[in-house]
């Protein structure tokens, strides 16, 4: 009977159950916290710091969101007055001077500006519409808390007065909402945060060193007009840095969208719950994110340096009636508030001159320039910040040191005669015998191991996009599950097939070699982009590449544990000599091709004795003198796994754990939050006209990156996890292909506007949205019954279908005024040149437009200010937008054009939907929409009434 040497149980051995269990534990131990951090907002403290009151902030938010309050609504004026009262209440509640002196500080002077004087003409909006001109009158509310290092004079009252102290700090929010949303997170939380900042920095112990300007701007939703007109107020010359508070979702965590530089980002590190990645900033820089915030005005036009902090999901509630307090929480308020307090406190307490220097834009404030930054959070509790040139240096160093280290290690292995890699055979000491090493086995499997799962997941992205493109809107995690399950199962299946056909102890090192090459190339690309384009979003590649390099180096160091190739050949010859006395012949090693197909793959349940030929530790096959003889006593080396190469008995059995810990955790920690953040941001952009394929391919790419660290080990998996994932894949695939893509918690947004020809009384209500859903919804409305709903592709919103029908006539103007009187205009044409003066007004509105069929060369609004920081560089203007702080105001606009007639329309807007019955077509749409659909504004006005004009050559 054969004697067996059974190995001791090793919980870290590179065998099936340890590999399956440990890798599963590592992935789950990291993925679960990442998901929790992404979806669970830290609880607000029961006892907030001195100077802050969360309950008060929540009560303010409820008042602010008790109705729609766009700029062109009566409630907007109510909110404006309420803000002034709240600010005065906060300032009136500040303690006496003695309490400040007890803390060795002076009570700060506070100035409140109700800016109902500033106006401005700008061009292009935020969408780079070259043919657009905008005149806007602001109603901003500005609070200036004087810093104890600031000028004590009222310099802003002097003509052309400028501050002589160091630059101050601006914190901005906007108090207007869209006409279809209550504005809880866009931007109600920002507004109540600013109110709390006024309270905090006027509380004893928090007096600022630098001046603090808190801006409540009005008109952000209509192309950032409030921030633009703020530039005309004298106090705007004081701040050099800023913090912009914004919202593009409903609840959740407030993320750091972007920042201008390393120095200004530093104070954000004080935040107790930092959240965000520089990758989102790169999205804005490269144009992948098209929407904008007031950040671009402060940083791009005014030359300030600052940060953009905003809520960013779920986008389905953004600009709808679900952007309310019901769908946010005190915890979300605290998350933004705590970040704002920490960041602002860091900025106003700065005692250096790093935010003072030459202007970085023409006409900008003298804020100097900063260094480009790399930043990201770790589990929502730690913020990592360093300069971009540091990342560049680290990448270059790793790109050079890594290959050199591996080269020198290879040389050392070669000198020690232990370089088994890529070696097919070895010679004995006397060089008479040649023994097989099979050192190349396993090298060529990685392209299949990596390529097949990746190609299939990308193929799934195309399949779902073709069959059910918007399922990701409501079921992003079903898509994630499908991709992950398919990738893991296919990677395991391919690796098991390869391992069955050609088992190799070098599967790990060769897989890591391929991974190292791919990550090295990725690091080169990241280095080039960081150096030439200033894009820091590839920072995760450095950590990914570093982990793979160390794991690969460990595999190289493992080879030192092997016998020299000559020594191994001598062992085989010695074993052959001992066996020849028994009539044995030299057989194949455990990984030889000959006879592999007939040999059953060893598993945990396979007999150690097996059947047929049996091998010794040196993998020589013992056979009896004849086929009926009893086999000689043999020794089976348990340190050789399955049918892998015999020399692998000497390889360490535990180092794979170290390699796993060097590759998987760092990849998940770096890439996991990016994946969640990115998909949360783009999964619901299909309803806005974005192509859904991008989101699915992004999931496939992130899946591949996060699961690639499994490839060196996955061939050791038991079948249990892969087969379970196969079932998950089949179930989620079917669901993703057939399920309805929208739900009452993830609604499809439909863009609404009603256009009225005031000369004829004919109106057209329009929904713009995804086909075929928008057409189905439009046809089901009672007012559309019996009509032919006309649908055509939207001219401005890409990939959206615009469906129109004759709606119920609106009643935005009280009284019995004829429709054509809703908009009034008078045109006076010059007698000697192509110039004309328009006098325009509208009833119960403060927003109108002049549209031209052919562009005018220039225009001027009477009484308007102009600013070279907002230059006019277009060939002509097709549209002039007019905004007034006064209801039923009359604008006087002079235009000039080339020779010929001038045709167009004068349009006025109505955006107030707080009173039922005023806009009955919209009331009907909201009442009869299915639960999975939501209304959002399709234009600045919910109702747009127009009257045509024509100026002939002889007029």
Curated annotation (Swiss-Prot):
Residues 574-590 have a biased composition (Low complexity). It is found in: Vacuole membrane. The record marks 318 as: Transition state stabilizer. Its EC number is 3.4.-.-. Gene3D superfamilies: Zn peptidases (3.40.630.10). One of its GO terms (cellular component) is vacuolar membrane. Glycans are attached at residues 53, 119, 826. Its main location: membrane. The chain crosses the membrane at residues 17-37, 391-411, 443-463, 474-494, 509-529, 534-554, 657-677, 694-714, 722-742. CDD domains: M28_Fxna_like (cd03875). GO terms for biological process: proteolysis. Residues 38-390, 464-473, 530-533, 678-693, 743-955 are vacuolar. Keywords: Glycoprotein, Hydrolase, Membrane, Metal-binding, Metalloprotease, Protease, Transmembrane, Transmembrane helix, Vacuole, Zinc. It is a multi-pass membrane protein. Binds 2 Zn(2+) ions per subunit. Zn(2+) 1 binds at residues 174, 186, 246. Zn(2+) 2 binds at residues 186, 221, 319. It is an enzyme of class 3 (hydrolase). InterPro entries: Fxna-like_M28_dom, M28_fam, Peptidase_M28, PFF1_C, PFF1_TM. May be involved in vacuolar sorting and osmoregulation. Belongs to the peptidase M28 family. This is Vacuolar membrane protease. It comes from Aspergillus oryzae (strain ATCC 42149 / RIB 40) (Yellow koji mold).
């Amino acid at each position: 009977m054969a004697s067996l040497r059974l190995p001791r149980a090793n919980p870290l051995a590179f065998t099936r159950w340890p590999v399956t269990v440990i890798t599963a534990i590592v992935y789950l131990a990291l993925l679960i916290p990442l998901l929790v951090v992404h979806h669970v907002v830290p609880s607000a403290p029961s006892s907030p710091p001195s100077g802050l009151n969360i309950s008060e902030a929540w009560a303010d938010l409820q008042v602010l969101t008790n109705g729609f309050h766009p700029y062109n609504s009566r409630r907007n004026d109510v909110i404006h007055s309420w803000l002034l009262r709240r600010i005065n209440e906060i300032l009136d509640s500040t303690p006496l001077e003695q309490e400040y002196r007890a803390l060795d500080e002076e009570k700060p002077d506070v100035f409140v500006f109700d800016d109902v004087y500033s106006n401005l003409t700008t061009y292009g909006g935020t969408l780079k519409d070259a043919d657009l001109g905008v005149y806007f009158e602001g109603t901003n509310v500005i609070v200036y808390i004087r810093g104890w290092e600031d000028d004590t004079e009222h310099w802003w009252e002097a003509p052309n007065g400028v501050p002589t102290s160091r630059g101050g700090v601006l914190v901005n929010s906007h108090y207007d909402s869209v006409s279809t949303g209550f504005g809880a997170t866009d931007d109600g939380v920002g507004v109540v945060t600013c109110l709390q900042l006024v309270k905090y920095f006027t509380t004893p112990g928090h007096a600022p060193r630098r001046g603090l300007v808190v801006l409540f701007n009005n008109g952000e939703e209509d192309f950032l007009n409030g921030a633009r007109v703020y530039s005309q107020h004298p106090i705007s010359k004081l701040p050099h840095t800023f913090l912009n508070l914004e919202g593009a979702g409903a609840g959740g965590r407030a993320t750091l969208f972007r920042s201008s530089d390393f120095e200004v980002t530093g104070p954000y590190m004080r935040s107790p719950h930092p959240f965000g990645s520089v990758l989102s900033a790169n999205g804005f820089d490269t144009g992948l994110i098209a929407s904008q915030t007031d950040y671009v005005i402060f940083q791009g036009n005014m030359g300030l340096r600052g940060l953009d902090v905003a809520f960013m999901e779920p986008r389905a509630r953004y600009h709808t009636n679900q952007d309310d307090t019901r769908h946010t929480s005190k915890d979300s308020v605290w998350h933004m508030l705590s970040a704002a307090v920490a960041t602002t406190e860091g900025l106003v307490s700065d005692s250096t001159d790093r935010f003072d220097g030459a202007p970085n834009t023409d006409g900008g404030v003298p804020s100097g320039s900063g260094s480009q930054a790399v930043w990201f959070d770790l589990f929502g509790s730690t913020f990592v910040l360093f300069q971009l040139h540091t990342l560049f240096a680290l990448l270059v160093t790793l790109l050079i040191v890594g290959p050199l280290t591996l080269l020198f290690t290879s040389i050392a292995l070669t000198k020690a005669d232990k370089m088994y890699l890529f070696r097919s055979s070895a010679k004995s000491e006397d060089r008479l015998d040649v023994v097989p090493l099979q050192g190349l086995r396993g090298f060529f499997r990685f392209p299949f191991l990596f390529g097949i799962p990746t190609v299939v997941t990308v193929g799934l992205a195309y399949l779902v996009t073709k069959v059910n493109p918007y399922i990701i809107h409501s079921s992003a995690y079903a898509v994630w599950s499908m991709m992950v399950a398919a990738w893991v199962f296919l990677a395991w299946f391919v690796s098991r097939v390869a391992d069955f056909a050609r088992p190799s102890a070098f599967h790990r090192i060769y897989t890591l070699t391929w991974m190292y090459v791919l990550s090295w190339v990725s690091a080169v690309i990241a280095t080039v982009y960081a150096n030439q384009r200033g894009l820091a979003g590839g920072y995760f590649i450095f950590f990914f590449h570093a982990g793979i390099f160390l794991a690969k180096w460990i595999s190289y160091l493992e080879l030192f544990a092997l016998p020299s190739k000559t020594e191994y050949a001598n062992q085989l010859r010695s074993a052959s000599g001992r066996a020849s006395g028994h009539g044995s012949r030299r057989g194949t090693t455990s990984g030889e091709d000959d006879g592999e197909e007939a040999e059953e793959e060893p598993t945990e349940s396979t007999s150690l004795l097996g059947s047929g030929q049996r091998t010794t530790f040196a993998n020589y096959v013992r056979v009896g003198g004849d086929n009926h003889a009893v086999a000689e006593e043999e020794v089976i080396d348990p340190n050789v796994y399955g049918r892998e190469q015999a020399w692998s008995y000497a390889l360490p059995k535990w180092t794979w754990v170290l390699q796993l810990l060097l590759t998987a955790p760092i990849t998940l920690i770096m890439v996991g939050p990016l994946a969640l953040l990115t998909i949360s941001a783009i999964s619901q952009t299909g309803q806005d006209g974005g192509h859904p394929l991008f989101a699915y391919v992004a999931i496939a790419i992130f899946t591949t990156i996060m699961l690639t660290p499994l490839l060196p080990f996955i061939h050791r998996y038991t079948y249990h996890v892969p087969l379970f994932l196969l079932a998950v894949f089949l179930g989620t695939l079917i669901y993703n292909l057939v399920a309805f893509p929208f739900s009452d918690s993830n609604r499809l947004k439909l863009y609404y506007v009603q256009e009225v020809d005031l000369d004829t009384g004919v109106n057209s209500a329009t929904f713009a949205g995804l086909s075929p859903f928008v057409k189905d919804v439009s046809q089901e409305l009672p007012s559309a019954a019996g009509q032919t709903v006309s649908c055509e592709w939207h001219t401005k919103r890409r990939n959206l279908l615009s469906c129109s029908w004759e709606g119920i006539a609106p009643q935005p103007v009280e009284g019995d005024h004829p429709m054509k009187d809703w908009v009034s205009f008078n045109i006076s044409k010059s007698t000697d040149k192509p110039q004309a003066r328009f006098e325009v007004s509208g009833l119960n509105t403060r927003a109108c437009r002049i549209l031209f069929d052919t562009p005018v060369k220039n225009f001027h609004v009477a009484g308007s200010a102009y600013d070279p920081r907002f230059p006019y560089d277009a060939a002509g203007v097709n549209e002039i937008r007019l905004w007034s702080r006064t209801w039923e105001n009359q604008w006087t606009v002079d235009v000039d054009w080339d020779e010929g007639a001038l045709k167009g329309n004068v349009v006025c807007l109505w955006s107030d939907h707080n009173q039922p019955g005023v806009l009955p077509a919209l009331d009907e749409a909201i009442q009869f929409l299915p639960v999975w659909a939501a209304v959002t504004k399709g234009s600045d006005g919910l109702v747009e009434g127009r009257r045509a004009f024509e100026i002939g050559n002889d007029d």
